[in-house]
Amino acid sequence: MENLGFAHYNLRAEWSVLEQLRDFYVEVVGLQLGPRPPFASRGFWLYAGAQDVLHLSEARPGEPREANVSGSFDHVAFRCRGLAACEQRLAARGIAVRRSGVPGTGIVQLFLRDPLGNGVELQFEEPEG
């Protein structure tokens, strides 16, 4: 087998929360809402450029979780541009952010939480200033 790279990740939640997640990942993280195949369940596919990277899938109330779903997820990271504008947008929305960096690389990391508490990293490789 040859691994060709990252395809997407999926978050599953009830519809009312799914709409909040969609708004967060579009308005805060900067993903774009895009086409989704006509599955029987409702949901959204969010894109970074031409690549679908986040699938939001409806879980019906009381629906059991699959056995392979684990509580070990820590965060997902997105490569981004526009650090200053992003920090201003997050501050204006009152979103709590932890700023960090990767030693020896110049990478700036912003860590935050989505409406369900999932970790999100916004990663910037651009020089500050």
Where are these regions (language model features)?
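Short amphipathic alpha-helices in soluble, non-transmembrane regions
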Residues: 23, 89-93
